[in-house]
Amino acid sequence: MRIGWTASLACLAILVLSDLALDESVAVLAGLFCLAPLIACSVLPTASTAAVMGLALAAAIASGFWNHDLNEPQQTVRIMGVLVIGSAAVAIAEVRVRRERRFAEMAQIAEAAQRAILPVLPHHAGGIDISARYESAVEGALVGGDLYDCYHTRDVTRLLIGDVRGKGIGGVEQAARVIRAFRQAAARQTTLADVASDMDEYLVPFFDDEEFVTALLVESIAPDRLDLVSAGHPPALMLRRGDGLAPIEIPNGLPLGTGLVAGFTETAVLWEPGDRLLLYTDGLSEARDETGEFLDLAQLKAPLAEPHALDGVLDVVRRHVRGGSLGDDLALVLLEHPAA
């Protein structure tokens, strides 16, 4: 707003000073004083634009005194021109302000809708510390085709991370559908493999031939064991306490929603207090710098050992793609076995 005031008043001041400097016989700049409210209407609110118009109109009238032509028809036309164009500028400012307000309200509604689609994960469930982050590849969007969710009861904790093939509104819609499928399946199926099969069956009618979702499912029943099922998803990364960072290699089934899967394989993974398991989508593994080089996931070992691990991971990704781009949405879920 300060820039708008500065530009408008500077324009008016230059025109007034020029009008004063010109010989009275050629002083015809008063009609141009309307430029000030025209500048104001593009950035200032309605009341401020009206104030600038008032100053421009007062300056145009004053111009008639110092040029001694206030009663001349030409000066009257100039003053009326400033009044008419200034009034139009005020009307333009009002239309602009209303439109900006409407856009802001729509943006708030869209933000609330996007946040409703992507669940807020609990910080602690089933003896596991949980944190999550999401980065959309679409500027201005909060969510896209990547997703995560957590289903927790007294007896079992189940987590999902997935990546829908697709972007934009279509990807968001399908991501919401996948989350719904997960919640239904997680609530009624007894094994993690059956959860994946149930989700696959549910999604088939909603996905066309080119649509699918990769997913990694994690289940915690016993304190020192995790069960994993992969449906075409990148492998989780395990950071062992006092050891290195390594992917968890498990059988990788077909993505969900294809209807081509006969069954899924569960794999049990032991973990100990202090261990951390990173679930991620391919926005992490496929992050490229300006030369097209992929991010080396080994660089994540140091930040994953820190207290605010996911913030550190995102910093590594941002530094890597600087000058390049985050070509896909990125979802991260970190599971930690609390230290005894």
Give residue spans per PLM region:
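Transmembrane alpha-helices and immediately adjacent membrane-cytoplasm interface residues
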Residues: 40, 44, 48-51, 55-103
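Hydrophobic, membrane-inserted alpha-helices
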Residues: 10-16, 33-38, 56-61
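Active-site-proximal, acidic helix/loop segment immediately C-terminal to a metal-coordinating Asp/Glu
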Residues: 168-185, 251-252, 265, 271-325, ...
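Subset of alpha-helical transmembrane segments and adjacent helix-loop junctions
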Residues: 3-8, 15-33, 51-52, 71-77
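PP2C/PPM family metal-dependent serine/threonine protein phosphatase catalytic domain
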Residues: 128-141, 200-203, 234-268, 293-294, ...
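Catalytic core of PPM/PP2C metal-dependent serine/threonine phosphatase domains
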Residues: 170-249, 264, 335
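DG-centered beta-turn motif at the end of beta-strands
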Residues: 45, 163, 233, 280-283, ...
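Regulatory cytosolic signal-relay segments
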Residues: 82-145
